[in-house]
Each structure stands twice: as structure tokens, then as C-alpha cells.
Amino acid sequence: LCDAILDSDVKKLVFMSSIKVNGESTDINAFSESSNENPEDNYGVTKQEAESVVRNKLDRSNKDFIIIRPPLIYSVKVKGNLETLLKVIQKKIPLPFKCIHNKRSIVDVTTLSKFIALCIRENTIRNELFLVAEKESYTTSELIEKIARDNDLKCLQFCVPKILLVIVLKVIGKGDVIKKLLQNLQIDCSKAVHFAKKFNDNEIFNKA
């Protein structure tokens, strides 16, 4: 792809990476553009390697690039893991996450689309990395409620201690989803917000 761009009239590449390049969870500090890269699965490693190719191929050329690392991308028509949650909600199956007080960043597909458009439109935004997310983070329980509300459904949730959920998930062979469901993954998107304000596009991050 980069070689094709170098041989074309394309002026800028906006590469959609993933927050998985930084890791699967955060502790005290949210991920930012200066955070260490620590991918924990093949998908994250692949995105990290692709970012490296983009930088190495285009950095010293006359082509510009933007790398964006989004977290979970949200829309009313949910896909992937969120679609699985929606199907559970539709079946009125109670979910045991009411007492999980984690915080996870998401980005609305509209917010992400508007920020991509900003990067394409403004020629002075070049060779940058952005972490793009909504200003508000959600607990797993709040995200489930949001999915239900946006689809005109009611969700049933009850409390199960976190340690018990961890044990159950490991026993049933779902240990890989522990971080996704129970731990924090927060993003500091202040750099992206700053650039949006700089170019008078404040409404991009007004949607929570």
C-alpha cells in the first residue's frame, strides 16, 4: 500500500490502527500518544508492525501520514463483541456486571469519522499519531445499559464479585475476555481535542 502511494498522486495516508498497540488495559494513567507500546495479542502486534511500515516508508517522502489508534468503535448498529452483548440483551438474559466499577474508553463512529475528515481536510496536520476517544468513559455495566437504551431495550443486570467472575471466566475457557470486560482501558484524547479546537471543529468531541 505504501509503495503504491509513493507511486501515485495521493498526498496523505490516514492509517487506522488500534489502541491494542498500547495494550489491553490501563492502571493509574490513561494511554496517551507518549505511552509505551505493549501489544498483547497478534492483532495488536500486526497493527504495531503496520504503523512501523507506514512511518519508515513515508516519513522521509513527500507524502504525509496520520496514524489513529481508536478504542472500541461504537454505533447503534453494533458489531463484534458488542453485537454479542446485544443478542444477550434481546434474549433478556441477566448479566452479572452491575458491580464492576471499571472504566473503558470508546469512540462513537460519528466522532471518529469527523476526526478522520479533519485530518484529511487540513494539510498542516501531517505525520502525527492520535488517540481518539470520547471524553466520557464507561463501566461495563454502563456500556451494556447504553447498548440497550440505544436499541429501545431493557437490560437485566445483577451483582457478582469481580474475583468470582474472574474464576468463572477462566474455568469456562474465556480468560481472554477478562481484561475486556472487567479491567480499565482509558484513553487521554487531549491531543486530538486540541487539534479539533485549533481548526475550529469543537463539535467533534461534544458527543459523549
Which residues make up each language-model segment?
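C-terminal amphipathic/interface module of NAD(P)-dependent oxidoreductases
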Residues: K146, L156, D176-A208
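Substrate-positioning beta->alpha
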Residues: V78-T84, F97-R121, N127-E128
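Non-catalytic, hydrophobic alpha-helical segments
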Residues: L112, I116, V132, L143, ...
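Conserved Rossmann-fold NAD(P)-dependent oxidoreductase catalytic core, especially the SDR/UDP-sugar
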Residues: C2-N42, L58, I66
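Mid/C-terminal beta-alpha module of Rossmann-like enzyme folds, strongest
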Residues: L118-D176
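Conserved beta-loop-beta element that borders a ligand/cofactor-binding pocket
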Residues: S52-V76
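Glycine-rich Rossmann NAD(P)(H)-binding loop
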Residues: S75, F97-N102, F130-S137, A148-D150, ...
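Short-chain dehydrogenase/reductase
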Residues: N29-S32, E40-E51, L72-S75, K79, ...
